[in-house]
Regions:
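Active-site loop/helix belt of alpha/beta enzymes
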Residues: 1-78, 133, 169-171, 177
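Charged (often Lys/Glu-rich) extended helix/loop segments that serve as interaction or gating elements
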Residues: 51-180
C-alpha cells in the first residue's frame, strides 16, 4: 500500500498488484484449501488498502498443477547396507526429482508392494552421489518391496517433467503420459 501511495503522489495510477505464487501442492496432506488463501489475501487487502483496492493477480502454480501429476517409478534394486535399507528407483534427482535435493519436498508415496513397512533410504538410478531422494529422514516403504515393483510420487505434477535431464549418465529423460 505504501508503494501504491508513493506512486500516486508522483502522478502515477497503479491499478494491478501481482502477489506472485507459491500455493503448495498437497504433498503431505497438510495444505490449506485454496479458499483459505483467498480469505487471507482479501483480509490483507482490506487492511492495507481499505476501499481503494487494486485489481489483484495471483499465480497459484503448483497448487493447481502439482496434484495433477504422479511420477510412477520402478524399483531397480533393494540393498541392505551398514546404514540401512536402500531402495533404488528409476526416478532420481537427474530424472525429474531435483526438488528432493536436501529433501526440500517430501512427496506422498505409495507402492505396488504390500505388507509391513520399514525405514529406507530412497535413491535414484545414477552413480552420482547426489542422486539420493530421502536419506536424512528415511521413508517408510513395505519390507516386501523388490526390483520391478512400483513406487508412486503423488502430487508431482509441477516441474518434474521439465527438470528431467536428457541423457545424464546415459539415462533417458522422464517420459510423460496423459491419462483421462
Amino acid at each position: 500500500a505504501a508503494i501504491f501511495t508513493a506512486l500516486r503522489e508522483r502522478g502515477l495510477s497503479p491499478w494491478l498488484l501481482d502477489l506472485g505464487g507459491g500455493f503448495p501442492a498437497e504433498h503431505q496432506g497438510n495444505s490449506s484449501h485454496p479458499s483459505a488463501y483467498g480469505e487471507a489475501i482479501a483480509a490483507a487487502l482490506i487492511d492495507c488498502f481499505r476501499v481503494d483496492q487494486p485489481r489483484t493477480l495471483i499465480e497459484p502454480g503448483r497448487g493447481i498443477v502439482g496434484d495433477a501429476g504422479t511420477v510412477v517409478s520402478t524399483v531397480v534394486e533393494v540393498v541392505e547396507r551398514g546404514d540401512g535399507r536402500w531402495v533404488f528407483v528409476d526416478a532420481g534427482i537427474f530424472t525429474g526429482m531435483v526438488e528432493c535435493l536436501d529433501e526440500a519436498i517430501r512427496y506422498r508415496l505409495s507402492t505396488s508392494a504390500i505388507g509391513p513397512t520399514g525405514p529406507c533410504i530412497l535413491a535414484g538410478p545414477t552413480c552420482d552421489s547426489a542422486d539420493v531422494l530421502y536419506r536424512h529422514d528415511p521413508v517408510e516403504l513395505p519390507l516386501s518391496l523388490r526390483a520391478g515393483d512400483t513406487v508412486r510420487f503423488h502430487s508431482a505434477g509441477a516441474y518434474t517433467a521439465c527438470y528431467s535431464t536428457i541423457g545424464f549418465n546415459g539415462f533417458a529423460p522422464m517420459s510423460v503420459r496423459l491419462v483421462n
